[in-house]
Amino acid sequence: TLESSSAASDVYKRQMLHRALFGSLERFIGILIENYAGKFPFWISPLQTVVIPISVDFEEYAKKVSNKIREAGITSMVDLKNHNLNYKIRDHSLAKIPLLIICGKKEVDSNSVTIRRLDSNKQENMELNSFLKKFSALNKAPSNI
């Protein structure tokens, strides 16, 4: 509350209303987006993984993998669009998805996944349970924040 006085020495109490277009949470999110240029750390990314089947023959396995990923507390979706593999990889890379999970015959036969990280063009094959254990640990927020 502000106080002001008149020429007759009367004291008036004034109130000021403050209104901001964005609150502190919105400003914080804006700073995060600007700082990371959309490439969020894995633990804070809104969509952490996209599972991409190589063809329609592997869609069931891709759905199974995505469900297991979600059960481990990692956000995931399956890309079932009717596009070729390179288009899907490019599309999700531009969307800055941290991990792309590729599923094909080799992965189905060995109960594994092929991982492609956003910051690398290299692909890594991992057994599914090892993948879940490793990335569940990465999904926890750092304790030094």
What are these model-predicted stretches?
Residues 1-8, 12:
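Single conserved hydrophobic/aromatic residue that forms the stacking wall/gate
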Residues 15-32:
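Conserved phosphate/anionic-ligand binding catalytic regions in large, soluble enzymes, centered on
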Residues 36-90:
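Generic long, charged, amphipathic alpha-helical segments
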Residues 93:
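Cofactor-cradling patches in redox/metallo enzymes
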Residues 96:
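A short alpha->beta transition loop at the rim of the catalytic pocket in nucleotide-sugar-dependent
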Residues 107-123:
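Amphipathic beta-strand/beta-sheet edge segments enriched in Tyr/Trp
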Residues 123-145:
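C-terminal interaction segment
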